[in-house]
């Protein structure tokens, strides 16, 4: 007899209903709905609870049709069955079906009514929920709290306050919800009154008050609450940390982060973001590297802070590492990397990101299209940018401005003007301030002065756009490039606002081109008053002094820079080779692994340049070195190093793309023109101002830059 019992216990396929219900619920929760159904079908004896569990399982796995089919097959139903059907439909967004079931119910209790009210609240139909709520024959704590939360979610704080006062028996959830809602609306003191009235507070209540203070710029009050909390969870610590980060108190956040007993992912992400805002990128990277686990937001945040703080190469390396580790980039991450690719002129990686956006069907979005256009423009692929532009029948202002700016930066003034003229005819978009900056820049770069003057005159009279300093800067730049200094000064004198650094900088740049030293000194004085720490002004004026042999003035400027702790921005150039971006600084190849090969290319180019009649321009070089050293130093400029490395590594016929953070120097411009001819290579150089397309010894700028 005992052995038979043991045998049945071991091998019986029938699971007692209570145990089966638990397992059905568990399997449903972890997504194994088909296994749950097999278990349900294997039960010889099914209770109403078994049927209810299986129906709930289908709803939990977003299978409302299967749930309803099983419900209709139930031999017996109780009110729990009906309530489960109403609640399940609501959770699946099937509001109308839920209401039909509710109306058909043979009997209803407070749970039935509450389920329907909660469903309407959950689906954003608070007005309908409110109407039902007041019709309820009876209400319990849950009913009141559900309606309260509905008002709060809908931003109806005053209605929530009135309802809160009517609740006969306020529980912890209702009070905490009210605290959260008031804090969200900035009514922190009222929230604190409710908090102080509570005889018992859960850790959630304490944390809600801490969060509320933090979100309302009262982080010191948040800390006082935090310090007296009877217990703290990971969420409590994280809320306090985020309060510090959101209020820019990064040092306090660092101190708190160090003593946190557990550092959850969300806390680490907040710390990375905070350190990034402060520019502490190395510290942020250490936090990221120390994380035992990371989520999508971790990668997104660390990539974003590197991109925003000018560490584009590191951001790109992180993106590559992310993909190697099998993490799929989120949409914001892809957008950040597109900006990185644009900054670095990394066409290969930009195309990869474009492909990912296409696979996810994000490329149909107008915003994404404008970001892609910008990336291709800055990588020198203007044709691909125009293809994206033409693909959209309905274009927003950003797309129009992007393509006009693209033509401007490539020196294609006529094409830019053509698009500008098409814009009003499209009927949907009117030119704005940015449009005119782009169009006037196009005229300036292309030397189309008369056309630029006409567009400037039409801004306010035809399009109703009042000139701002950016437009004046474009006009001064355009007139100055053309050598029309009197008109440029008249333009400045006519300004209704105070000229800014962009205006004086435009005129100073023109002075360099036309060797107008007297005007340059006047402009530099104005610029130093506005931006005393900007090294560009000192360097440009110093170069002009050097070109005229005024070495005493050069020394005086150097002394002034030293006194004011002004440091020259180092020139840096990038080129993409074998799907990797390589950076070069002036003279900076001593530590390069391919130093010898690069030096050989430089020597070869030096010989070819001399044979082609190249005459080095040493006019801006320092006077305290001999002529041979001056000439030798020129070939180690960052843009020359990048071109040399690209020639070394890229196959014949492949265009060379180089990006420089500063304006290309006149000597390198001349040298690269000749290199493009003697090496029969197209070289695309993007400097701080514009693109230079070198081909067969000519530049697209026509030496008008």
Swiss-Prot record:
**Any one GO molecular-function label of the UniProt entry:** RNA binding
Q: Which GO annotations describe the biological process of this protein?
A: RNA modification
Any one GO CC term of the record: mitochondrion
Query: Is Nucleotide-binding included in the keywords of this UniProt record?
Result: no
Record: transit peptide? 1-11
Name the family: Belongs to the PPR family. PCMP-H subfamily.
Cross-referenced PANTHER family, in alphabetical order? PENTACOTRIPEPTIDE-REPEAT REGION OF PRORP DOMAIN-CONTAINING PROTEIN (PTHR47926:SF478), PENTATRICOPEPTIDE REPEAT-CONTAINING PROTEIN (PTHR47926)
Ranges: PPR repeats: 16-46, 47-77, 78-112, 113-139, 140-170, 171-205, 206-232, 233-267, 268-294, 295-329, 330-364, 365-395, 396-430, 432-462, 468-498
Tell me where in or outside the cell this protein is found: Mitochondrion
Spans annotated as Type E motif: 503-578
InterPro entries attached to this UniProt entry? DYW_dom (IPR032867), E_motif (IPR046848), Pentatricopeptide_rpt (IPR002885), PPR_At4g14850-like_plant (IPR046960), TPR-like_helical_dom_sf (IPR011990)
Chief location category: mitochondrion
Report what the protein is called: Pentatricopeptide repeat-containing protein At1g09410, mitochondrial
Q: Where is this region: Type E(+) motif?
A: 579-610
- Any matching Pfam family: E_motif
Specify where the region named Type DYW motif lies, as residue ranges: 611-705
Question: Which UniProt keywords are given for this protein, alphabetically ordered?
Answer: Mitochondrion, Repeat, Transit peptide
């Amino acid at each position: 007899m005992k052995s038979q019992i043991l045998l049945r216990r071991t091998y019986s396929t029938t699971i007692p209903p209570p145990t089966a219900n638990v397992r059905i619920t568990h399997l449903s929760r972890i997504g194994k709905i088909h296994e749950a159904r097999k278990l349900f079908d294997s039960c010889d004896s099914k209770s109403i609870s078994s049927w209810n569990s299986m129906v709930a399982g289908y709803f939990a796995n977003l299978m409302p049709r299967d749930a309803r089919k099983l419900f209709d097959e139930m031999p017996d139903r109780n009110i729990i069955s009906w309530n489960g059907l109403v609640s399940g439909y609501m959770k699946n967004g099937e509001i109308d079906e839920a209401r039909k079931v509710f109306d058909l119910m043979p009997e209803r209790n407070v749970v039935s009514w509450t389920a329907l009210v909660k469903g309407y609240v959950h689906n954003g139909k608070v007005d309908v929920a409110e109407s039902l709520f007041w019709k309820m024959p009876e209400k319990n704590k849950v009913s009141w709290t559900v309606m309260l939360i509905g008002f709060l979610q809908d931003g109806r704080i005053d209605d929530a306050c009135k309802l809160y006062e009517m609740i006969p028996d306020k529980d912890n959830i209702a009070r905490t919800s009210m605290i959260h809602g008031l804090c969200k609306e900035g009514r922190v003191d009222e929230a604190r009154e409710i908090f102080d009235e509570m005889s018992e507070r859960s850790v959630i209540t304490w944390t809600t008050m801490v969060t509320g203070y933090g979100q309302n710029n009262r982080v010191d009050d948040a800390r006082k609450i935090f310090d007296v909390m009877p217990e703290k969870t990971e969420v409590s610590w994280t809320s306090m940390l985020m309060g510090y980060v959101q209020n820019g108190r990064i040092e306090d956040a660092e101190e708190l982060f160090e003593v946190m007993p557990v550092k959850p992912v969300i806390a680490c992400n907040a710390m990375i973001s905070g350190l990034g805002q402060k520019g502490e990128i190395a510290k942020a990277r250490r936090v990221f590297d120390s994380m035992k686990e990371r989520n999508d937001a971790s990668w997104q945040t660390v990539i974003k802070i590197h991109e925003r703080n000018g560490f584009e190469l590191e951001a790109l390396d992180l993106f590559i590492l992310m993909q190697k580790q099998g993490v799929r980039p989120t949409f914001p991450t892809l957008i950040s990397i597109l900006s990185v690719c644009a900054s670095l002129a990394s066409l290969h990686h930009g195309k990869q990101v474009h492909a990912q956006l296409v696979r996810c069907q994000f490329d149909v979005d107008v915003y994404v299209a404008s970001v892609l256009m910008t990336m291709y423009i800055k990588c020198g692929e203007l044709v691909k940018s125009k293809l994206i532009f033409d693909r959209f029948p309905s274009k927003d202002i950003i797309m129009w401005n992007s393509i006009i700016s693209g033509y401007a930066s490539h020196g294609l003034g006529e094409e830019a003007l053509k698009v500008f003229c098409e814009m009003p005819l499209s009927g949907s978009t009117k030119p704005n301030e940015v449009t005119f900056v782009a169009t006037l820049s196009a005229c300036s770069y292309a030397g189309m002065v008369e056309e630029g003057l006409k567009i400037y005159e039409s801004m306010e009279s035809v399009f109703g756009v009042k000139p701002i300093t950016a437009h004046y800067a474009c006009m001064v730049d355009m007139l100055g490039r053309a050598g029309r200094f009197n008109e440029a000064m008249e333009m400045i004198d006519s300004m209704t606002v105070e000229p800014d650094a962009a205006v004086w900088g435009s005129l100073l740049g023109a002075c360099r081109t036309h060797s107008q030293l007297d005007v340059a000194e006047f402009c530099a004085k104005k610029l130093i008053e506005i931006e005393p720490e900007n090294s560009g002004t000192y360097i440009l004026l110093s170069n002009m002094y050097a070109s005229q042999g005024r070495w005493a003035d050069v020394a005086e400027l150097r002394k002034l820079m030293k006194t004011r702790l002004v440091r020259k921005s180092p020139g840096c150039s990038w080129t993409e080779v074998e799907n990797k971006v390589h950076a070069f600084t002036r003279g900076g190849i001593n530590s390069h692994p391919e130093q010898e090969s690069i030096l050989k290319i430089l020597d070869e180019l030096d010989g070819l340049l001399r044979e082609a009649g190249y005459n080095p321009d040493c006019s801006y070089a320092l006077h305290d070195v001999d002529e041979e050293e001056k000439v030798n130093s020129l070939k180690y400029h960052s843009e020359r190093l990048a071109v040399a490395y690209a020639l070394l590594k890229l196959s014949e016929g492949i265009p060379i793309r180089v990006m420089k953070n500063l304006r290309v120097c006149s000597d390198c411009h001349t040298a690269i023109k000749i290199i493009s001819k003697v090496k029969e290579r197209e070289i695309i150089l993007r400097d701080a101002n514009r693109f230079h397309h070198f081909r067969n010894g000519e530049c697209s700028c026509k030496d008008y830059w």
